[in-house]
From Swiss-Prot:
Lineage of the organism: Eukaryota, Metazoa, Chordata, Craniata, Vertebrata
GO BP: any one term: protein ubiquitination
Purpose of the protein: Acts as an E2-dependent E3 ubiquitin-protein ligase, probably involved in the ER-associated protein degradation pathway.
InterPro entries: RNF103, Znf_RING, Znf_RING/FYVE/PHD
Protein name: E3 ubiquitin-protein ligase RNF103
Zinc finger (RING-type): 618-660
Parts of the chain that traverse the membrane: 6-26, 326-346, 366-386, 411-431
Enzyme class: transferase
Keywords: Endoplasmic reticulum, Membrane, Metal-binding, Transferase, Transmembrane, Transmembrane helix, Ubl conjugation pathway, Zinc, Zinc-finger
Record's compositionally biased regions (Acidic residues): 525-542
Amino acid sequence: MWLKLFFLLLYFLVLFVLARFFEAIVWYETGIFATQLVDPVALSFKKLKTILECRGLGYSGLPEKKDVRELVEKSGDLMEGELYSALKEEEASESVSSTNFSGEMHFYELVEDTKDGIWLVQVIANDRSPLVGKIHWEKMVKKVSRFGIRTGTFNCSSDPRYCRRRGWVRSTLIMSVPQTSTSKGKVMLKEYSGRKIEVEHIFKWITAHAASRIKTIYNVEHLKEEWNKSDQYWVKIYLFANLDQPPAFFSALSIKFTGRVEFIFVNVENWNNKSYMTDIGIYNMPSYILRTPEGIYRYGNHTGEFISLQAMDSFLRSLQPEVNDLFVLSLVLVNLMAWMDLFITQGATIKRFVVLISTLGTYNSLLIISWLPVLGFLQLPYLDSFYEYSLRLLRYSNTTTLASWVRADWMFYSSHPALFLSTYLGHGLLIDYFEKKRRRSNNDEVNANNLEWLSSLWDWYTSYLFHPIASFQNFPVDSDWDEDPDLFLERLAFPDLWLHPLIPTDYIKNLPMWRFKCLGAQSEEEMSESSQDTENDSDSDNTDTFSSSKDVFEDKQNVHSSPGRTSRCDTEACSCANKCVSSPCERKRRSYGSHNTKEDMEPDWLTWPAGTLHCTECVVCLENFENGCLLMGLPCGHVFHQNCIVMWLAGGRHCCPVCRWPSYKKKQPYAQQQPLSNDAPS
């Protein structure tokens, strides 16, 4: 996860550098920056009308270019970036979809229940023609959609009862706007009553109703009262301009940010004394001033702060975000990070997509689960101080120059989605190249074949389904494993005629280990000293040792052949019993010339774990156990050299070499064996 987060941050850094590179190219070719001001006098009449269209100002009664230019200057400074965006949007001329309502419930859900936006609906009465023709309606839809106004058509033939109840007996236009200034308030429906059915007149009607919700100040005394007043709004944005009404984008934003930001329009058209505005720091007209508890911020002095709906919307969202905005941002970041798995994962193509789908599901599930306690926490009372400090931190960070660059880059890449996707793909391919190179240098094996990887995935799935891995520690000792219904499947899996289960080797570390010891055995140093002390008498000792060895061998044969004697090992329980004729402890004692008693040369069975079978030879290497060697036991009770059985199990043979019992599965322990005696029963 941290690797993917690092690559995502690296990708954002690449986008930031790439945007600065594009700015440098534009400056080199044209000699201008996006923040450079444009003189409206140098623009054509068509470009001036395009700017007014994007800002939402009517120009139908202004035939002269001079009047249009003055209206542009009164609404705000024009930058190169805003001019470029407006011309690009005009050239695109994409068709905007309009909603067709199917009935009362559909209309209620989208229009009356939507409390943070504006709807323009054309109602077509039964057996009547629409009020606005098809061509003019398409122009109307395109014009109002720039300001976030949604459109739709309600045909009364689909629900005549609802139209009669509403009083829609003739074709008309309906506009829905929030009724109060609080968030998620009631919605009121306004019906168009004008006589002229033209796009400009209808648009003026819409903007007039939207502007009526904005607090308007006409004199200095009212401005002083409002400027010094402290109310529930922490953020206020003022528009000081010489206009009849605020631009349409300003009115649309006031509805979108209802309850979060207060929009105030200061009409300075007939003001004679403007000294108070100088006292509060307003020197230029028009001015967009953001008033916060931290101070005054002049909108339009930084990169990307254009006089447009999209630019101011991103600016206000960064200062006063909703919980939904933060959730969408986290959702985008998490999914961008999850898609990095497509390039980090090496191997077959199907493997990449399987890992990608798994990562997407995991990350999105964790995101939703982590947001649930956050939403519960935000609903707790007495969190005003927490909200205040959080929003203050956002305002401090998002009014910096770096934040303005980030917002400008966000608007640039959101308007060029193909560039965003191509850079992401190129970044991912570079990650894939370096990751593949790193694995090759480390000699990591990668399944590049789809069939090979699918085969290994199927083996794993069938092994997990038919051969579940049991915990070595948690099985009860007193259970009857011979009556286990899974035993049949377990034993069928080990002959190579069926499945090759993929079993982890973690259970090996839990197997019992101990050292083989003999009764009365000395250390190696003591044995060496004893050997040096008896060096001069080696001839006589060798004779005695040979005689003693011969006697011991004869006694062994007698004990083994006697039907009344018990063997050193239980032959029914251990297949190693026939190997225990000569004790390794006895051989080691004889090699050093020891003359201990025969009882002292027996293996110390008390040090063996309970449930293990007594034997003195490893059936893997066919070597006897030496004093001090490391032993390891299996759940079935058989004992082997530790190195021998680990190599056996690590090779994929997860069963006992003697009885084929699964090496990871506990078995009902055998009865505790008693130390063996050489004395025959009477």
